[in-house]
Amino acid sequence: MSDEITILPTTVIGSYPRPKWLRETIRLHRAGKVNQEDLEEAFNDAVVTVVRDHQEAGIDVPTDGEMRRDEMVEFFAERLSGFKFYGHVRVWGDHYYRKPSVTGKIKYNNPMLLDEVNFAKSVSYTQNLKVTITGPYTISEWSYNEYYKTQRDMAFDLAKVINQEIKNLVDIGIKVIQVDEPAIHTRKEDVEWAIDSINESIKGVNVKVVLHVCYGEYSYLEPHLDKLKVDQINLALKNYNYTPVKLFKKWDREIGVGVIDVHNRKIESVEEVAEDLRKLLEYFKPEMVWVNPDCGLKLLPRKIALQKLINMVKGTLIVREELKKKGYTNTTLKPLINR
């Protein structure tokens, strides 16, 4: 695998809409009408579909769409010791999830992602596959704590098991790891130790590490940016009309800029994406900018999600060509800092 990638690399955050036939297969499996082997085949077929969509759109660094994950915390809690589920809780509107409870010491059992990542690698059009994993603070924040003295203690035990999982992914050749922390700015007083737990989760990881943050009070994060040991911060920006950008002007590593609003079915035009990128490049060095949607696309209809990605890439290509005329060609896939 080359250590270089084209200037303004395009990527996705992680999740992608499940095809309707996969949702139906999952429903039938839960009703006892589809066996586990057929369900696994359906998951694999869905990953192939996602990879083809990403290829059609022209995404430089794709994911597997998180086809096997019902929810970003539940998936990992099901696979770790120390968690128990009591039932569903309401998140917002008519959306529910199985909020886990921590009832014992959190321990790592077996690799959680290796099989699905190996399959995604086998069908991907590029070796530059990104793998996402929910971070320690978000899992601790979105779980009930019935065991640990403090949430901080819980988060640091989570960080240790996440670190094991990430290192297993690195061992099979994954070069880009994204830690998802949408909850990191829930409470201002937690941010400093939350960052410490994230750093613990990526300790000794010698590939590119991305931190995805979205939808919250970015100003809580800004005073602590210098403590983050990640190569890239990936942000939801379009939904905010880019107003948080000024908080990250001093950030001197990579930044993933969200230029697609995932909570709006309106499809951004190619020129809209290009113009937004030109404005963002007034704040950040071109070689440090990656291009992505604000967040995961799973809640959008698939046709809309795909067209949003197509337009995102086309808009990026316009600005990429403008940069090439100024002498910019490639950027690096290597990690930028030692951990």
From Swiss-Prot:
Pathway: Amino-acid biosynthesis; L-methionine biosynthesis via de novo pathway
Organism: Sulfolobus acidocaldarius (strain ATCC 33909 / DSM 639 / JCM 8929 / NBRC 15157 / NCIMB 11770)
Family that this chain belongs to: Belongs to the archaeal MetE family.
Record note on cofactor: Binds 1 zinc ion per subunit.
Transmembrane segments: none
CDD domains (alphabetical): CIMS_C_terminal_like
Cited function: Catalyzes the transfer of a methyl group to L-homocysteine resulting in methionine formation. The physiological methyl donor is unknown.
HAMAP family linked to this entry: MetE
GO biological process, one term: methylation
Sequence positions that bind Zn(2+): 212, 214, 295
Pfam families per record: Meth_synt_2
Cofactor: Zn(2+)
UniProt-listed Enzyme Commission number(s): 2.1.1.-
Any one GO MF annotation of this record: zinc ion binding
Enzyme class: transferase
Keywords linked to the UniProt accession: Amino-acid biosynthesis, Metal-binding, Methionine biosynthesis, Methyltransferase, Transferase, Zinc
Protein name: Methionine synthase
